[in-house]
Amino acid sequence: MIHNDTVADAKANPDLEQPYHELGLKDDEYARIKELLGRRPTDAELAMYSVMWSEHCSYKSSKTHLRYFGETTTEEMKSKMLAGIGENAGVIDIGDGHAVTFKVESHNHPSYVEPYQGAATGVGGIVRDIMAMGARPVAVMDQLRFGPADLPDTQRVLPGVVAGVGGYGNSLGLPNIGGETVFDATYAGNPLVNALCVGTLKTEDLKLAFASGKGNRVILFGSRTGLDGIGGVSVLASDTFEEGAERKLPAVQVGDPFAEKVLIECCLDLYRANVVVGIQDLGGAGLSCATAELASAGDGGMHINLDNVHLRAEGMTAAEILSSESQERMCAVVEPENVDAFMEICRKWDVLASDIGCVTDGEHLVIEHCGEIVVDASAHTMAEEGPVYERPYERPAEQDELNEPRGVELPETSQEVRQQILDLAASPALCSREFITEQYDRYVRGNTVAAKDADAGVLRIDEETGRGIAVSTDASGRYARLDPRTGAQLALAEAYRNVSVTGATPVAVSNCLNFGSPEDPGVMWQFREAVHGLADGCKEMGIPVTGGNVSFYNQTGDTAILPTPVIAVLGTIDDCARRIPQQLPKQAGAEAGADESQEQYHLVLVGAETREELGGSIWQQVVHDELAGLPPQVDLSVEQRLGAFITDQRDKIVAAHDLSEGGLSQAVVELAIQSGRGMAVNPMLSQHESAVAQGRTLAQQAAVGLFSETASRVLLAVRSEDYGDLMRDLAETGLTGGWIGLTGVSDAAGQPVIRFGSGVYPVLPFGGEIELDPAKQHDDDFDIVISLDEAETAWKSTLPALFSHAAGNNSVI
């Protein structure tokens, strides 16, 4: 027999000791709950308040800083925003009746405990957020962070996470169109699994999360409610992983992607039938969150009967039903006259649905179970009146030492530079992610235009017009550790640039802010700086933050992760047929591996002048195993002008690739390998005077040109006949740019090679032929040659060697 702690019991036994500490509540928070209720809470009320007031649900440590996004968002920035911060996901009007919704969410802590299910349900949760906006989910992306690649625990976690992301997304029929995978010691024991979903809808189909209209019915539909995931996200995300703590953690949710696939189609049918007043997905905090948020956002209260909830387990108490985080569930508000039609559509899709209550007068959420009242509280106090902490923040004492300029030991010889190019390409930081991305279906549904080896994923959303979107997610914890404000703006700049190089126009931003414990003043300083940097950057660029997520307590014991603000940028493109590819085109009839039979192109570096900016760089990490100095400067006005120039010139640009981690060296290596073409590049050209210091050897100067990570730079491939016009147009923008190399370079045997040399100059004036000037070649020049085969082997071999035999999918419990 089920025994619930009822409201009557709470009044009759006011001094009953309750385990509020175990549920993550502090003494003052528990006292505040009793003050709001005028009595002690019931077990069910205590469960609801504990999850709704958790860090994950209430944003109690971050809310005071997140308000800055609203303060810096202008009316012009809001003009195309149909839904923003506070909704399940942001929605942007992109014209012609089309809208796009997108959001990034974290599922970090569950993915360490149970990598496969943690990652899978992270994808499922963000997909349901998109569904709840009235949209069809059309693509996913993932931002992953792990400990060192050769660490045994990484070899347990990574395969499970990748299998979970791929298994769930592939089963849903959603293409995975991009992301990032990063390795760093601070993520050992606390991986980051951030998932993005993007959806499309007609503007008139937008749905919001609110319960409105007295007498309207509340319908729970989808999978049954079970014991899996009780307290999962909401409690896990409010604690740190100390040694041995994983044994105490509650179960991670278990996902069923095929149930979610049916749920997607069911929801879309319900929207088409116009039988939904408001809708909310059940994610973190389960039915507690869905009912409290729906009621709080609406114009009334709510009466719920838990006896009508379809259960997977017998004997579940009210607190367990309300706290369950079982997946693939939604909660809708429906007018009484539409209930039959709603249920009929659910039966059509074989989706369980039950009428669990109604919208009432007032603001109270009343919940009954087994004929007894177990919850009687203001929904607003649960959803909106949680504690808001003004956590102390302070610049860490070690920050000055961390930022001190360090003398960099540059390579002395050409051979050292050559080896470092290969070392960077082969490093876990920069090597090919093909081992991971090949486990994802990138082209399901047939609308993926770019995903493999692309700076941004490009998706067609209208087959008649070719209209499309481009999405990129970026972050650099290394930059943010050195300067969180600049680090956040560099992530924004790179995501913006990645979208721009496809020929798309950036229009909106989402974010997922991953940090250590908010109880550490140094972490809160990092967080505040990153938020202000991102908000100020978005205001300067005129693109709004439409929503996001905060994940705190990402640390193992006292060791916090690198501050990791993940930034997603959404762009629109009027015709996907005109998008700019990242690879050179394959020429019909050209022989594989023979560059002489391929059309040649000029390589042009445009944007900012290359400066000596090696602080926080991948070169510093791989060659010197160090994190020190200052990150690159960022000028967002240059980024905007660069993006506008590329979009304007897209018909003259054959291929474009942004320069970011690894600098010019990695950009050329990737472009050459992905295009299957040889290339010759002069790293001395287009450098700022700071990068060509007096007294340095040619090898040292070349190293700065190759490995510096100066922001706002893009490598373009241009036909000879378009070069002059493009350069004249570039001069009018005030941007720096110039010839830096050419494609179609091979060795004496005709095999493609990558050549970096100070003697690489074109024959002038530019004519129909693209060739190097032999008069510029000297014996004492800096000159190195790497065969394309050698570069490709270095770039592609690392992850398979590390992970192809890893066990994966293992739980620590």
UniProtKB/Swiss-Prot annotation:
ATP binds at residues 59, 103, 511, 548. It comes from the Bacteria. The active site is at residues 56, 107. One of its GO terms (cellular component) is cytoplasm. Its main location: cytoplasm. GO terms for biological process: 'de novo' IMP biosynthetic process. It catalyses: N(2)-formyl-N(1)-(5-phospho-beta-D-ribosyl)glycinamide + L-glutamine + ATP + H2O = 2-formamido-N(1)-(5-O-phospho-beta-D-ribosyl)acetamidine + L-glutamate + ADP + phosphate + H(+). The keyword Repeat does not apply. Part of the phosphoribosylformylglycinamidine synthase complex involved in the purines biosynthetic pathway. Catalyzes the ATP-dependent conversion of formylglycinamide ribonucleotide (FGAR) and glutamine to yield formylglycinamidine ribonucleotide (FGAM) and glutamate. The FGAM synthase complex is composed of three subunits. PurQ produces an ammonia molecule by converting glutamine to glutamate. PurL transfers the ammonia molecule to FGAR to form FGAM in an ATP-dependent manner. Monomer. Part of the FGAM synthase complex composed of 1 PurL, 1 PurQ and 2 PurS subunits. This is Phosphoribosylformylglycinamidine synthase subunit PurL. It comes from Corynebacterium jeikeium (strain K411).
